[in-house]
Amino acid sequence: MIRVKKSVELINPPSYGELLSTVERAARNCYQSENKITDGSAEKIIRFLINNGHFSMIEFADLTFKMVMDRATAMQLTRHRLCTFAIESTRYCNYNKSGEIKVIVPEGLNDSAYDTWYTSMLMAETAYMKMIQEDKVPTEVARSVLPQCLATTVFIHVNIRELRHILKLRLDKHAQKDIRVLVQELLELVYGMYPVFFEDIYEEYGEYSD
């Protein structure tokens, strides 16, 4: 059994300038004001759009991510149906080939609970391998014993309006800590690369707290 960490990676990231230009040109098309495009005008108009709730224009900017998370977190994230998802399938992936499963340690375990959790993970791994190796059942049946904290890779394609919505919901103190930690890393990444689109959210949630 391998313990892995949550992670967020941006796939084929567009430049900041490309996103700025796309959104500004779309917004200015509504008023035929393309002649007002200057150096620095894009950030100004995008900030105006966001501050005044005109979010449809930022839907023209989209991003693709590769994330590693536990299955329970993936179930929460895929509720955001304005995204496109490609999720590692436990029906077709055969973890017996590597001889072990990958898991993510849940947030909030104390020492005693960690020992119980670790023992349970080993039991689940053993049962899964036995069902495939000895009982000769297909992976779609053996997966029934896999844990919720099984590490899974998820590709996510999302426009920036929906991404902002996800960040606000999943960084709220009422969200489960496991998804908050993952989405905090996501916020740090996108704010660092595309600041004007996320500066208001970063101002509120830029530092994670329990």
Segments from the language model and where they lie:
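Family-specific signature for flavin-dependent thymidylate synthase
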Residues: 1-210
